[in-house]
Amino acid sequence: MTALPQPGPARRWEIPDHLLTIEEYAALGETETGFTELVEGRVVMSPSPSRRHNKAAYLLGRQLESQLPPELDFTLDIDVDLGLAPRGEAGFSRRPDLLIAYREANARVDDEDGMYRAGDVLVAVEVVSPGSKRTDYQVKHDEYADAGIPYYWIVDLTEPVSLVACHQAGEFGYMDAAAVTGTFTTDVPFPVEIDLDALLD
């Protein structure tokens, strides 16, 4: 019988003594558990999402994949430099549960810093968790709009599963459509139909 390898000690983070730029944040790398985001130069740590949450994001990606135009691609759980601060100043980076980005950005993300830029992203998607409702519906809503991300979808797994589709409305930020349950259908930014109930496993 082969023994399973024992996990090593968790990587210890040095708590920064100053507000971080995007470059400093990217240099921190990944944590052993949970994930981080950067908000006005402050590292915000969150626990790892639940299995149900991650499965819903994965199932959403599976439904989207065959419906995306060839120039678009989806990615789960990756940092986005929101570009809300000049280089060298305290930065903003969020990690949407799923994003739809222009395929041409993938090579740069893979080769360079592993981080999308807000201008690469067409749709940011957050799956609401019990501890993230206000952040997803209000804080990220405003940050993604300020960053110029054209579309933001908020998926709430509270039954019945719902999706709120937000789109840029000029100087007013996002305009939010009414929450949809059952099947979400739209023609913008591309024709898509999503069975929301199928996001529950």
Residue map of PLM features:
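Gly/Pro/Ser/Thr-rich low-complexity, intrinsically disordered segments predominantly at protein N-termini
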Residues: 1-201
